[in-house]
């Protein structure tokens, strides 16, 4: 294979990957648990917002609130992973 052609393809892939990273950072997904806890996350999976309704807070049952928070985070993380899969689907790279 021609080295110049290979280098050009690598540069194009780097530009495309940079664009994808920017797009993922700008996108947002939301995960919820029983409507009591809501988590927003960007396309990279970084939590950007956490909302807890007052009725979710029970001093005698902190474990239930912890479970709701985890469920909301995991729900949002699944959606963020979906965005990542969609964004990288056209690259044809294994593991992306």
From Swiss-Prot:
Gene inactivation effect: Mutants display an increased sensitivity to oxidative stress, and a slightly increased sensitivity to ionizing radiation and UV exposure.
Gene3D superfamilies for the chain: Nucleoid-associated protein YbaB-like domain
Gene Ontology MF: a single term: DNA binding
Name assigned to this protein: Nucleoid-associated protein DR_0199
Free-text function comment from the UniProt entry: Binds to DNA and alters its conformation. May be involved in regulation of gene expression, nucleoid organization and DNA protection.
This protein's UniProt keywords: Cytoplasm, DNA-binding
UniProt superkingdom: Bacteria
Chief subcellular location: cytoplasm
Keyword DNA-binding: yes
Signal peptide span: none
Recorded family membership: Belongs to the YbaB/EbfC family.
Subunit structure: Homodimer.
GO cellular component, one term: bacterial nucleoid
Organism annotation: Deinococcus radiodurans (strain ATCC 13939 / DSM 20539 / JCM 16871 / CCUG 27074 / LMG 4051 / NBRC 15346 / NCIMB 9279 / VKM B-1422 / R1)
Localisation per UniProt entry: Cytoplasm, Nucleoid
């Amino acid at each position: 294979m021609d080295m110049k052609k290979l280098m050009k393809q690598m540069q194009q892939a780097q530009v495309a990957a940079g664009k994808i990273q920017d797009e993922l950072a700008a996108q947002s997904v939301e995960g919820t648990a029983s409507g009591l806890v809501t988590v927003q996350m960007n396309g990279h999976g970084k939590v950007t917002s956490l909302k807890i309704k007052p009725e979710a807070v029970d001093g005698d049952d902190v474990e239930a609130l912890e479970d709701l928070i985890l469920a909301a985070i995991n729900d949002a993380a699944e959606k963020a992973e979906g965005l990542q899969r969609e964004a990288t689907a056209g690259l044809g790279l294994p593991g992306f």
